[in-house]
Amino acid sequence: MLERATFAYGDLWVLRETDLHVPRGGDLLVTGHNGVGKSTFLFLCAGLLPATTGRVLLNGRAPHLTTPSDLVRNGVRRGVLFDSGGLLSNLSALNNVTLALRYHADLFGLDDQEIERRAREALTELRVTQGDFHALPAHLSLGVRKRVSLARAMVLDPNFVFFDDPDAGLDSPTRTLVYGILERFRDDPRITMVVASNSRPLIERMAVETLELSHGYLLRRNSQSPHSRNPAG
């Protein structure tokens, strides 16, 4: 996933030279103080940000140098959950979910009817009510926005998932729902998952390899499935 990778904003190092290997079907949870760069690290691993130096690879491909369609053709289907939802403000909840399917419609051989069916199915599984399907994100609560974002992340049947603070700001029923989905991903040997969170209930419930990001270094906090090394590790 990371080969001698670094990331910096000017003189501020978020990640110093690091090698990180997460095996196929493996899971990693990254903690760290607020402001340390957990979200940046997550987006770096997902290929949404380019490394300052070194390489980020998913299934042997550098995602920020590869088109989304080429990634899918080479066996990389990414699902990303942003901490605030990350939905497009001018699209309804339903259209936010259908967007990814429409982008890859030719690749997957999907027509409009199948695209809408899959999107509605994903939203319904996440307990988004039909009354919210056509609402813009600004008219949805944080909990609903996160559920819509999670539906968008799931609808392409991803084999790489990246979740930023997935349970932050959620009520208890929504949190329980999200935990169940995370556990399903964790237990699926086809899916590689990286989560950034400081949530103690989530950390305890997930029970996966946990690293702490501190001053640009990844420090091991448990060794259930060790697969990371860096100068401070």
Task: Enumerate the language-model features and the residues they cover.
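Helix-to-loop junction immediately C-terminal to a conserved catalytic motif
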Residues: 46
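ABC ATPase NBD coupling module
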Residues: 63-79
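Q-loop/switch helix immediately C-terminal to the Walker
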Residues: 91-106
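Conserved ABC ATPase "signature" region
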Residues: 113-131
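Conserved ABC ATPase signature
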Residues: 136-140
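Hydrophobic anchor residue at the start of the ABC signature
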Residues: 150
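Catalytic Walker B motif of ABC-type/P-loop ATPase nucleotide-binding domains
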Residues: 161-164
